[in-house]
């Protein structure tokens, strides 16, 4: 099982590793990031947010960046006693921007990986992402490996990372590929598919549109821990932001904001991470 889990992790993170490698190829010359004292003196914390990862980051009706990450970023500024400036970043920009000192910290589904930890530092985990199985209460599945059956009809989004996992680990299952998540979820709701493997945290907005007794298989395939990225070696800032994240967890602020934006509780507690100290 350990070997399978390691294979899964390599399979799912290969795209991210390649993207990281590409990003690092284009990294600007590293300049010294602002220290915690400099941030406090300037009364401004500059945080990168990716608005193309709803509901972590979105553009609202006023064309302003909004979402879970923005709420967290503003709360971080409040806890540090400074204002927060939001800077738009894309997935390829996140690490280069924080590594070069263009921003003080970065949000945006920053999964804490060994590869990323070579070039930036992370706070304690802010939230998690759970790779799991979406199905209905009418289906008996208790473990994702039960899906490796010719009678099982899986649906996946064309080009999404789990497609390769399904093809390699669940070759006996039927596989329907559709172009987007609304269509994939609709296929299950209409009975054209039995289940889907993906990050479950982002499914609520799609499942809420269908009057179906949805169910997420209890045993997750993998859990990813996401933190806030800062420039390598900026220890005082990292420690201060980690303390702020812990305070937000303790006060219930993270849970409250997550429920607001995701429509339900976080599926896995980030405080269970070995790095949450």
Which residues make up each language-model segment?
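Extracytoplasmic small-molecule ligand-binding "clamshell" domains
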Residues: 33-109, 118
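Ligand-binding clefts/hinges and TM-proximal coupling segments of bilobed small-molecule sensing domains
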Residues: 161-176, 216, 246-277
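Periplasmic-binding protein-like
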Residues: 127-135, 200, 204-246, 264-277
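A ligand-binding cleft/hinge motif common to bilobed small-molecule-binding domains
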Residues: 93-96, 110-118, 165, 189-222
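Flexible hinge/capping segments at coil-to-helix
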Residues: 135-153
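Short helix-initiation/N-cap motifs at beta->coil->alpha
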Residues: 85-96, 141-142, 176-186, 190, ...
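Beta->alpha turn/N-cap motifs
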Residues: 49-53, 87-92, 101, 105-113, ...
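Ligand-binding cleft/hinge of the Venus flytrap
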Residues: 59-61, 73-82, 144-149, 162-178, ...
